[in-house]
Amino acid sequence: MATFTTADVKRLRELTAAGMMDCKKALEEADGDFDKAVELLRIKGAKDVGKRAERTTANGLVAAATDDGVGVLVEVKCETDFVAKGERFQELGRRIVQAALTTETDDPAVLLDAVVDGRSVRDLVEENSAALGEKIELGRLARFAGAAVVSYLHKTSPDLPPQLGVLVELSAPNAEAGKDIAQHIAAFAPRYLTRADVPEDVVAAERRIAEATAREEGKPEQALPKIVEGRVTGFFKETVLTEQAFAKDPKKTVQQVLDDAGVRVVRFARFRIGQL
């Protein structure tokens, strides 16, 4: 019969973050051999991660960090809001975003191999997945380095960690403008920075839709060109950051606000859990 104490079970749980019953079973299977029990739990955790691979990660958090002209925005996903609101999962997010800040990549696959306190981000994700009993994965990653980078995080629920985040690179430092623009992006979700960034096929599709809709509405043939141009312009005002009405002063466009501040947006990223 295996010989071990309650203290052994507790120590194994603290080391592996596995459940009490799992720790007890592992010690029994290992005949009280502590190191073997650790190995058994790690194997079990890896198997459980494999079983969770097909599950959907519709919850999670968005984390951000900035330092000396470098900023990162990271999406860490899990299955349920129960796990998302837990301190262990949120600590994982903090560790991953710090790794992202010191790793020169915007590729999530590369970040997974980055080392944090002697362990890879991949190992941290898998260990927490095993401990929390849910599929956890690293989602999107943005990393900007420039004259000025500003981040903004927003909680969609007071009980959950931030699930909406924005990262903005400006052409020059301007804390007030950076904060205002980041909050605007969070609220209005622009898809493009300028009109020139909208792909030609997207514009062509909008023109076709506008023309077809106008015809269905019975608009006069001679009026179609003007109607189509008006609706395409409306599309730009809705989806292009610089052409949107500014959140804090709708009488101005974002471009006018940037001009007044003497800066321009170089690029931006906006992540919201559950949205592409």
UniProtKB/Swiss-Prot annotation:
GO terms for cellular component: cytoplasm. Associates with the EF-Tu.GDP complex and induces the exchange of GDP to GTP. It remains bound to the aminoacyl-tRNA.EF-Tu.GTP complex up to the GTP hydrolysis stage on the ribosome. Residues 80-83 are annotated as: Involved in Mg(2+) ion dislocation from EF-Tu. Gene3D superfamilies: 1.10.286.20, DNA helicase RuvA subunit, C-terminal domain, Elongation factor Ts, dimerisation domain. Keywords: Cytoplasm, Elongation factor, Protein biosynthesis. The keyword RNA-binding does not apply. It comes from Acidothermus cellulolyticus (strain ATCC 43068 / DSM 8971 / 11B). InterPro entries: EF-Ts_dimer_sf (IPR036402), Transl_elong_EFTs/EF1B (IPR001816), Transl_elong_EFTs/EF1B_dimer (IPR014039), Transl_elong_Ts_CS (IPR018101), UBA-like_sf (IPR009060). It is found in: Cytoplasm. Belongs to the EF-Ts family. The lineage of its organism: Bacteria, Bacillati, Actinomycetota, Actinomycetes, Acidothermales. This is Elongation factor Ts. Its main location: cytoplasm. It comes from the Bacteria. GO terms for molecular function: translation elongation factor activity.
